[in-house]
């Protein structure tokens, strides 16, 4: 090993990088050592610099020129020590080594164990002695080491102990001739020690050097017969350690020989054996590392030593002291010789297991997802791979992208496929502005919704209660809008909501049931329970509200209220007088009989329910209806559920927002404040809000605008997502039905509720052959923009409900050849669109069997064809009718009868039991035994 220490190697041993080289050079200057990037140091300089960097012990280095090369440095050291050149040639590492070089012989395993200390260089007079190369000059890289006089005294004591062990060994040698060579080796080692002792005395006045040593792993066993280059790299060891190792080795051998006769035992592991697997760089120091070579032969870790005299400390104390000395300046690495990381191997296993856990996604068993969620959001919440989710939907016949929304059915299917338990949450809850209203709850009026079948007298009954005649103002005498009114009875107010009874207004009835406290089901006593009656009862049951039955038209003759009660009892609504829970009040909207009894029953039910609400704070209301009025813009009918809505308040309702400009009650009077359960018509909206949306009051316009924009963005993305979803079945239908007939329509209505009802009714008319395509719908009048949307379509039509186009729009419609149709009754609109669809649909073709004939003989006539001689077995065979030729129960040809003859005469038809001759059009492959089956096609119109 070279006597010079390269700066880069020094940095590597410290665990520092090249980036920290500058700091090391600066620290070297502090102790008087000038270094450069490629400089080398003597072991003494390296030792002092190490103590300064790690321990903070500052020892000044005498000013001298740093060695430019290892050869010059070694020459200076040799001149200082005045060591004779023959010394290195004469003294080798061990006597065994010298003997091996002079006479190479194969060595036994025992000899290798006995010569375990031989790879360690001996110190003679404080100088490291390293084997020389054969036929070469003495190595110049050996740096002389000088030790103190105290070490010489210790060496003498060790020598005496070795002398005693030698005497014991001689006795063993007599009993066992095989150990003679070991004794000779011991004698040679002792002679070498004496020579080293003399050398120590010569140089005892030379200043002792300090240094450091690093223990490294040497996994392969050193062989004494290796070449000199390998031997020159063998580690050195202190004199005291060498003597201690020799003593322990021979003592162990004495014990083994003594026990050999009794019981063979396995030799114990000794520190010497450990030294066989270590590589030591020793710069002589006063420190004694006898018992501190803590090295585990079975681990790959590199151990860092404290460089101080160590007591018998446990591993935890050693690690704590090491961390404190290093002070977080040494990087911890797997093979770093400066850190004792005894648990690295075990920790690496944990890391590998941790990586394996991360590579596999854990599928959750229960997840909470919103009601409408995108594909990638579902994958994230369920901790699934997005590709697996899309692949599963693809295999189920649904092509989606990661941004598409999943409907409830798709979510349930995915939950089954991935074995998940889901809890669906309301999507719009994240958009809700939660505000805790503080205050005292006060009594509020009940909200009563009147529902029932069409033409059962709901609006007429409400008109009688209000002393108004609203039914006469409705087109066709049927209610087509949802209305809200306030009625006072016995100094108490009751809010009534009138819902349409037509089947098209199912969603209106549902909204009315959602905001109501009490449901009044109006049933005509002369008509009984009908379809919309059952639907209204289902809405009330879903809303969990009490139901009161009003048996209307009791003034008519031949009414049967008991029959009506029986029909309701079959549905689960038993009358009170039959032992049930539901009140059946007989009333007459024409005469007014039973009205007071109905109102009193409603108030009693409200008292039982103890309806209360907080009046202070921001308002929360429900939009019952929205429309556009000339001169007022977008307006909405709202009913307040909590808080107070005042003129000037900012609000938002779905995508609409604004500030309350005016409020008008059902009597047309202007009001300033709207308290719970009160209804009014408000203005000041940015657009018509959807019917059934929640209106929420906020602090200012900016908050209202922001909330409305959030909802608009969400609804837009949702609509785009739904438009991109196409199933395989739908694609195949579109390809197969290239002649699918679509009727593009634009629908404009006066109110949002009516518009919604018309759209739903028209979409129900669609079938596999023709369909109505709503390309635009809105509240308000017909504009030129509506005309431009349908101008390029052949069958396009614009439908207006309760609105009239202006003269300019009519002229543009003629120019674009666009049909505009307006209606005031929803019945007429739906029936006309049904007729239009039927006209575009192909008729239904049915077959009618007319006759059957059996072939008895065939005649081939040149230039004419084959004529079949037949007997009519059933019905009548006519000329020009379609016929099937059946052979052995299989239809082989279908065509028309070209010629029909009886004998030589042409006839129009032949009846059952008669013979005839039949010739088919362009077919001559007729055989005896074939059967003719004739039929005619009947075209029938389709119905919707």
From Swiss-Prot:
It comes from the Bacteria. Its main location: cytoplasm. Residues 452-459 are annotated as: G1. Residues 552-555 are annotated as: G4. HAMAP family: IF_2_B. Residues 443-612 form the tr-type G domain. Residues 498-501 are annotated as: G3. The keyword Ligase does not apply. NCBIfam families: IF-2, small_GTP. Keywords: Cytoplasm, GTP-binding, Initiation factor, Nucleotide-binding, Protein biosynthesis. GO terms for molecular function: GTP binding; GTPase activity; translation initiation factor activity. Residues 175-185 have a biased composition (Low complexity). InterPro entries: EF-G-like_DII (IPR053905), IF2_II (IPR044145), IF2_N (IPR006847), P-loop_NTPase (IPR027417), Small_GTP-bd (IPR005225), T_Tr_GTP-bd_dom (IPR000795), TF_IF2_bacterial-like (IPR000178), TIF_IF2 (IPR015760). Residues 132-150 have a biased composition (Polar residues). This is Translation initiation factor IF-2. It is found in: Cytoplasm. Gene3D superfamilies: P-loop containing nucleotide triphosphate hydrolases, Translation factors, Translation initiation factor IF- 2, domain 3. Residues 204-215 have a biased composition (Basic residues). Residues 477-481 are annotated as: G2. GO terms for cellular component: cytosol.
């Amino acid at each position: 090993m070279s006597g010079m220490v390269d700066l880069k190697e020094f940095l590597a041993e410290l665990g520092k990088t090249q980036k920290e080289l500058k700091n090391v050079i600066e620290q070297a200057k502090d102790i008087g050592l000038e270094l450069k990037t490629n400089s080398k140091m003597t072991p003494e300089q390296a030792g002092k610099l190490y103590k300064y960097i790690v321990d903070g012990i500052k020892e000044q280095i005498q000013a001298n020129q740093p060695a430019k090369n290892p050869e010059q440095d070694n020459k200076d050291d040799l001149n200082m020590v005045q060591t004779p050149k023959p010394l290195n040639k004469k003294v080798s590492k061990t006597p065994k080594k010298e003997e091996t070089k002079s006479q190479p012989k194969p060595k036994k395993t025992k000899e290798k164990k006995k010569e375990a200390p031989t790879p360690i260089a001996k110190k003679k007079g404080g100088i490291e002695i390293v084997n020389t190369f054969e036929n070469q000059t003495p190595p110049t890289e050996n740096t002389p080491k000088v030790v103190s006089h105290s070490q010489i005294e210790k060496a003498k004591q060790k020598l005496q102990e070795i002398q005693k062990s030698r005497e014991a060994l001689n006795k063993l040698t007599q009993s066992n001739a095989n150990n003679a060579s070991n004794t000779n080796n011991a004698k040679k080692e002792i002679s070498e020690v004496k020579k080293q002792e003399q050398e120590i005395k010569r140089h005892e006045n030379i200043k002792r050097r300090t240094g450091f040593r690093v223990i490294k792993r040497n996994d392969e066993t050193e062989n004494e017969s290796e070449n000199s280059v390998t031997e020159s790299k063998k580690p050195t060891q202190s004199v005291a350690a060498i003597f201690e190792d020799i003593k322990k080795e021979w003592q162990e051998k004495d014990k083994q020989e003594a026990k050999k006769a009794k019981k063979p035992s396995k030799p114990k592991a000794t520190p010497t054996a450990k030294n066989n697997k270590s590589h030591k760089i020793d710069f002589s120091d006063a420190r004694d590392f006898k018992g501190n070579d803590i090295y585990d032969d079975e681990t790959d870790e590199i151990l860092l030593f404290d460089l101080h005299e160590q007591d018998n400390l446990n591993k935890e104390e050693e690690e704590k002291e090491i961390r404190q000395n290093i002070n977080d300046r040494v990087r911890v690495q797997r093979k770093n010789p400066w850190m004792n990381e005894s648990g690295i191997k075990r920790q690496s296993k944990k890391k590998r297991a941790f990586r394996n856990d991360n590579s596999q996604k854990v599928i959750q068993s229960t997840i909470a997802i919103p009601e409408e969620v995108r594909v990638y959001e579902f994958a994230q919440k369920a901790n699934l791979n997005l590709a697996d989710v899309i692949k599963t939907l693809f295999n189920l016949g649904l092509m989606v992208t990661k941004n598409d929304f999943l409907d409830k059915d798709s979510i349930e299917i995915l939950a089954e496929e991935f074995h998940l338990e889901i809890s669906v949450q309301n999507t719009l809850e994240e958009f809700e502005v939660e505000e805790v209203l503080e205050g005292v709850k006060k009594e509020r009026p009940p909200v009563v919704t009147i529902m029932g079948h069409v033409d059962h007298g709901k609006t007429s009954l409400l008109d009688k209660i209000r002393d108004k005649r609203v039914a006469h103002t409705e087109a066709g005498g049927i209610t087509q809008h949802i209305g809200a009114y306030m009625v006072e009875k016995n100094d108490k107010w009751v809010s009534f909501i009138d819902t349409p009874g037509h089947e098209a207004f199912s969603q209106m009835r549902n909204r009315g049931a959602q905001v109501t406290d009490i449901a009044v089901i109006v049933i005509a006593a002369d008509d009984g329970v009908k379809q919309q009656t059952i639907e209204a009862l289902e809405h009330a049951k879903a809303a969990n509200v009490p139901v009161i039955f009003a048996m209307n038209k009791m003034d008519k003759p031949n009414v049967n209220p008991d029959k009506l009660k029986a029909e309701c009892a079959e549905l689960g609504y038993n009358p009170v007088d039959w032992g049930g829970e539901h009140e059946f009040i007989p009333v007459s909207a024409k005469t007014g009989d039973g009205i007071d009894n109905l109102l009193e029953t409603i108030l009693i039910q409200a008292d039982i329910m103890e309806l209360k609400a907080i009046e202070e704070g921001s308002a929360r209301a429900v939009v019952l209806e929205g429309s556009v009025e000339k001169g007022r813009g977008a307006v909405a009918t709202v009913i307040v559920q909590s808080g107070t809505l005042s003129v000037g308040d900012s609000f938002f309702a779905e995508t609409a927002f604004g500030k309350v400009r005016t409020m008008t009650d059902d009597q047309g009077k202007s009001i300033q404040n709207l308290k719970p359960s009160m209804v009014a018509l408000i203005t000041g909206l940015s657009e018509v809000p959807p019917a059934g949306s929640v209106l929420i009051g906020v602090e200012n316009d900016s908050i209202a605008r922001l909330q409305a924009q959030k909802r608009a963005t969400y609804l837009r993305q949702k609509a785009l997502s739904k438009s991109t979803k196409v199933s395989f079945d739908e694609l195949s239908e579109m390809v197969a039905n290239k002649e699918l007939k679509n009727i593009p329509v634009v629908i404009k209505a006066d109110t949002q509720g009516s518009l919604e009802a018309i759209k739903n009714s028209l979409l129900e008319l669609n079938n596999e052959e023709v369909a109505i395509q709503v390309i635009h719908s809105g509240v308000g009048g017909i504009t030129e923009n509506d005309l431009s949307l349908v101008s390029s379509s052949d069958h396009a039509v614009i439908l207006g409900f309760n609105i009239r186009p202006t003269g300019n729009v009519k002229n543009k419609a003629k120019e674009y050849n666009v049909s505009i149709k307006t209606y005031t009754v929803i019945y007429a609109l739906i029936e006309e669109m049904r007729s239009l669809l039927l006209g575009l649909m192909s008729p239904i073709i049915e077959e009618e069997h007319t006759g059957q004939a059996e072939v008895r003989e065939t005649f081939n006539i040149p230039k004419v064809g084959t004529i079949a001689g037949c007997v009519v077995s059933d019905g009548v065979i006519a000329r020009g009718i379609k016929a099937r030729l059946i052979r052995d129960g299989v239809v082989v040809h279908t065509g028309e009868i070209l010629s029909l003859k009886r004998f030589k005469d042409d006839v129009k038809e032949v009846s059952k039991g008669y013979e005839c001759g039949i010739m088919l059009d362009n077919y001559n492959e007729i055989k005896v035994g074939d059967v003719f089956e004739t039929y005619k096609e009947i075209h029938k119109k389709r119905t919707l």
